[in-house]
């Protein structure tokens, strides 16, 4: 008999050779009908795999992330089979599951895949699916594997780097592929498929290697799931931050300035400034001190911090001074600079914690093919802060940072999120620096803080940084997509590298603990996500322009200026549209700019010292006429519902 531990902690005994499917049947028939994959002792296995030792078992359905991963990986095998049939002579390379689907990188040789072929590929995949071919994993010797793929230099290279005894093939129908495993039971579960696109991709991601063709696809267990997904993609196109950024005149890019270097236009700069002032105000209440550091630093600074060794390939080339022979780097991180600020003077335990905050611009070299709007850029500004505290202060400081992150999310309409607690892999302690005692303190601080703040959490072992555990906030946007926003990290590494100290109550020198935190992450990426989440309808307090005054004709321009002055006295951001256009055109343009309030002024309004309000997106609901003071109350009441005061 063997003992199987289930996710709820219960332990069941089974005959040696039991399969995950057998375990599912012992739990419920419903689970047995829906289980498609499993993990045994944290290793993905098929549900037909015979289990011969004690261990922990997790069963996955389509609703689980790992279930989808197995589903999409299996579909990539079927697509590879079809591509091999349709394009004789091609060479398959790698075909993993990715977010929302899968891809396969292919060397098509002298042939070429075109979009017109997609429907044929989809139809053939579904034909094979209906035949319900089982996915079967089998071990092979390295010699046999190399023999099979002697004419495919890509698979040959992969196999050459594997150890004998670890190589497996996956068979279904007449198709065989090199694979480690993680498949659904059979092709019959695949009911809907869509080939999404093709793109160029270098072998193993190295631009020095041959460029292959990457074929992207997705699949689902129901046709309705695919239909819903495609509708979601259409909505995502409408919300694309690159499209909205151009339409709303927020930011632009210039080839002369350089790829991945956004230019913030007046309205976009105003939006950024509002976000910065919002966070600075909260940080001031939270005891943070603003600092400013240069855009460059000596290479030696980043060698000391370890960033150059780890991220040197992602940094721009060093800048050498003409005469002194010094080497500088465009700043890839703010934290080394903040360590040097801490080191300017000696500290006592009575002085701690020290909280340094900065909107610091950093630079990373991203390959041109990886750049994407504001989400992947080469220059970006982080809302960085670093807290230097004693080990005894760690718990309380961590909770305070969580409070700040929750305040930011609540003020900006991000209500659906999960906190991922990333801990070390205790089986591989050599991967991490610092004592077991410090690690346990830090991990417990994060776990306890998340519990005390009633966060919805998931725990990921082995996902901690080498220098300390962390808490990542995974936010779902209006389209149900998950984004990592807001990170809090505990760091024992940099205080050691920079020899940071404070004098304790025992008059001895001690190392402080360092906390990295960035609620936004980067201003560029955060604004991109916020744009797509809100479709450009930002919270009223954040809008660059909260109202626009529309004159029925130019003879009401003097009154419009009077209205503008009164609005400014109430700290309402507005402007006047006095163009020689029809009122209908002015309204349409204001709607396109997503201006929250259109204030129409004409003869009646001037006579009665009023304005006629039209709300964005409420066509056909009629206008209401109010005084300026009444309108100011409407605006302030709406803002007060979303923008609360940060309570320490």
Swiss-Prot record:
Zn(2+) binds at residues 335, 386, 516. Residues 1-61 form the TGS domain. InterPro entries: aa-tRNA-synt_IIb, aa-tRNA-synth_II, aa-tRNA-synth_II/BPL/LPL, Anticodon-bd, Anticodon-bd_dom_sf, Beta-grasp_dom_sf, TGS, TGS-like. It catalyses: tRNA(Thr) + L-threonine + ATP = L-threonyl-tRNA(Thr) + AMP + diphosphate + H(+). NCBIfam families: thrS (TIGR00418). HAMAP family: Thr_tRNA_synth. This is Threonine--tRNA ligase. It comes from Flavobacterium psychrophilum (strain ATCC 49511 / DSM 21280 / CIP 103535 / JIP02/86).
């Amino acid at each position: 008999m063997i003992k199987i531990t289930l996710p709820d902690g219960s332990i069941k005994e089974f005959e040696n050779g039991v399969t995950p499917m057998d375990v599912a049947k012992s739990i419920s028939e419903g689970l047995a009908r829906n289980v498609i994959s499993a993990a045994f002792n944290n290793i993905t296995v098929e549900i037909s795999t015979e289990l011969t030792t004690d261990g922990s078992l997790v069963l996955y359905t389509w609703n689980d992330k790992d279930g989808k991963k197995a589903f999409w990986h299996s579909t990539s095998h079927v697509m590879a089979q079809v591509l091999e049939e349709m394009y004789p002579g091609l060479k398959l390379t790698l075909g993993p599951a990715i977010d929302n689907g899968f891809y396969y990188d292919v060397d098509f040789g002298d042939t070429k895949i075109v979009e017109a072929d997609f429907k044929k590929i989809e139809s053939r995949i579904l034909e094979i699916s209906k035949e319900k071919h089982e996915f079967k994993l089998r071990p092979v010797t390295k010699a046999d594997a190399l023999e099979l793929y002697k004419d495919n230099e890509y698979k040959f290279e992969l196999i050459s780097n594997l150890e004998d005894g670890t190589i497996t093939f996956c068979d279904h129908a007449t198709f065989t592929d090199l694979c480690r495993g993680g498949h659904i039971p059979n092709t019959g579960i695949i009911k809907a498929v869509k080939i999404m696109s093709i793109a160029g991709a270098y072998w193993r991601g190295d631009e020095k290697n041959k460029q292959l063709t990457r074929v992207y696809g997705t699949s689902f267990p129901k046709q309705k799931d695919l239909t819903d997904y495609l509708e979601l993609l259409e909505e995502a196109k409408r919300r694309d931050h690159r499209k909205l950024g151009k339409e709303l005149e927020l930011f632009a890019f210039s080839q002369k300035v350089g790829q991945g270097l956004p230019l913030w236009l007046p309205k976009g700069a105003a939006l950024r400034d509002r976000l910065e002032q919002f966070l600075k105000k909260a940080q001031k209440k939270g005891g943070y001190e603003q600092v400013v550091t240069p855009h460059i630093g000596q290479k030696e600074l980043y060698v000391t911090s370890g960033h150059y060794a780890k991220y040197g390939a992602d940094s721009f080339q060093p800048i050498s001074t003409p005469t002194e022979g010094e080497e500088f780097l465009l700043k890839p991180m703010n934290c080394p600079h903040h360590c040097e600020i801490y080191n300017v003077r000696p500290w006592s335990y009575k002085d701690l914690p020290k909280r340094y905050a900065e909107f610091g611009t950093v630079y990373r070299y991203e390959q041109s093919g990886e750049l994407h709007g504001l989400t992947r850029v080469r220059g970006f500004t982080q809302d960085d802060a670093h807290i230097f505290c004693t080990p005894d202060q760690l718990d309380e400081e961590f909770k305070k940072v969580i409070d700040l992150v929750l305040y930011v999310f609540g003020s900006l309409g991000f209500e659906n999120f999960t906190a991922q607690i990333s801990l070390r892999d205790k089986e591989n302690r050599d991967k991490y620096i610092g004592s077991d005692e410090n690690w346990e303190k830090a991990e417990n601080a994060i776990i306890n803080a998340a519990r005390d703040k009633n966060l919805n959490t998931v725990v990921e072992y082995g996902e901690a940084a080498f220098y300390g555990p962390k808490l990542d906030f995974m936010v779902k946007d209006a389209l149900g997509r998950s984004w990592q926003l807001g990170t809090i990290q505990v760091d024992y590494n940099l205080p050691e590298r920079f020899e940071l100290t404070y004098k304790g109550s025992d008059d001895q020198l001690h190392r402080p603990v360092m906390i990295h935190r960035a609620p936004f992450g980067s201003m560029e990426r955060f604004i991109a996500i916020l744009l797509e989440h809100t479709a450009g309808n930002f919270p009223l307090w954040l809008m660059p322009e909260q109202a626009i005054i529309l004159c029925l004709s130019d003879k009401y321009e003097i009154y419009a200026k009077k209205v503008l002055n009164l609005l400014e006295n109430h700290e309402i951001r507005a402007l006047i549209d006095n163009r020689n256009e029809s009122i209908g055109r002015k309204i349409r343009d204001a709607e396109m700019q997503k201006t929250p309030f259109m204030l129409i002024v004409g003869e009646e309004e001037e006579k009665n010292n009023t304005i006629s309000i039209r709300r964005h997106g409420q066509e056909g609901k009629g206008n209401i006429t109010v005084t300026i003071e009444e309108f100011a109350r409407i605006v302030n009441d709406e803002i007060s519902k979303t923008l609360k005061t940060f309570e320490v």
